[in-house]
């Protein structure tokens, strides 16, 4: 069970009116933990590239899921896994959200929805909690660009000592 966390809205976040902002760690953490994830977005220059990529990929593969499964997400067959936990693939986001330098934006892909406990286990296995801090979320269905392949957005940064 996750500990109770008190969060305060960063002052700079409240004052922003432009869409080309770069989100700080405090911004990302606040928006994720307060369930305002729709406010986190790509930089406009990345969004333009993403939209062109989506159009081209849909023309070539029919769906984004087809593209991902044929080029990036090579899940083991059910007969090759002995674990009860579903296999996952961790990849950097090719079109990351607009976050400041030092924040990684990765995706945890699966063939089945993942529980929060399992997501935490995956992250802790790959990123030592003493060295890293993170927040994660699943986009609501209305803004998911890949609806048929469950995936979790994770933002990480090295802990500041």
Where are the regions a protein language model picked out?
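HIT superfamily nucleotide-processing domains
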Residues: 1-161
